[in-house]
Amino acid sequence: PDMYLRPDLDTFAILPWRPQQGKVARLLCDIYCPDGTPHERSPRYILKKTAREAKKEGYTCLVDPECEFFLFHTDDNGVPTTVTHEKAGYLDVSPVDLGENARRDIVLNLEDMGIEVESSHHETAPAQHEVDFKYGEVRTIADRIMSFKMTVRTIAKRHGLHATFMPKPRAEVNGSGMHIHFSLFKDGRNVFVNPGNPQELSEEAYYFVGGRSEER
């Protein structure tokens, strides 16, 4: 074989939307080469390696994402469209928010899988929604984002809808993004904070911002 998939047992979860008889579980895997070494281009391996190196220096990175997506209709043949009949906007609720039941179902299924959800709401554009996770260790949250996307698509389909995470599926309305809040801790202290600075930002925080700007 070219590669091996090695299951990460910490990611085991029962899929709550599947029949309870003959239950179906989800496991995420790490990619390994035939010689038993991790595949160095695997995004999951790169993230785990980076987190390990940070931990050696005493740092723990915590993140919480704001995951945005659209829920559109499908046509008579089940083909996805960018059509919606709702006119809801930011923080609207039912009956204006026609996707509220689907979003609620998504959140309940995520929680049944052990994924902690902090909040959910309708976003700015019609048919646009947001689900926010509770903060957690960076690799755990990355894994949860992958499970989140699978869950959203699955539950949306059960409601007769099509979910898309495209940044800009419709030109005339707001697009979707994924804001990610970062914090870096050492010895239980948020190292990005410096109360003595006018902006209350530490030297590490400025280095972090500079590094992110350089990557862009």
What spans do the regions from the language model cover?
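Glycine-rich, acidic/polar active-site loops that bind/position phosphate-bearing ligands
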Residues: 1-214
